[in-house]
Amino acid sequence: MGRSLATTLFVLVLGLGFAADDLSAQTLPSRAAPGAVFLSERAMAHILARHGPESHAAGAGKFAPGMTTPDIRALIAEAVHAGIRRADTDGRPDALYDDRFARPIGTTIQGRPTPRLRVVVAPDGAVITAYPR
């Protein structure tokens, strides 16, 4: 299976790699994570359903109108690679990656424009969710 143009551009722009022939789980580089971080199609589906530009879910930050799935994947990859990593709260074993971009990427729960993104990563390296905050 060949890479799509969007995938090729994504790899060239951010210098990221994908599993050989499987784009269902995208490996993301992280300078802070002890192991590989990956974004599954299931996690991406959750992110789009709850936080995507078309989502009507209440009580959730949303990505900006017009953002595509590749755009959101690129933001997540950048946050995991360059964001600040810290432990999750209340004893949860997950890691939180917080990053601030040069422009608004979406809206907060309150509906205000925000340049900030949080990515939640499980101990096994699986991205659980990502949302503007």
Each language-model region and where it sits:
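Bacterial N-terminal signal peptides
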Residues: 7-17
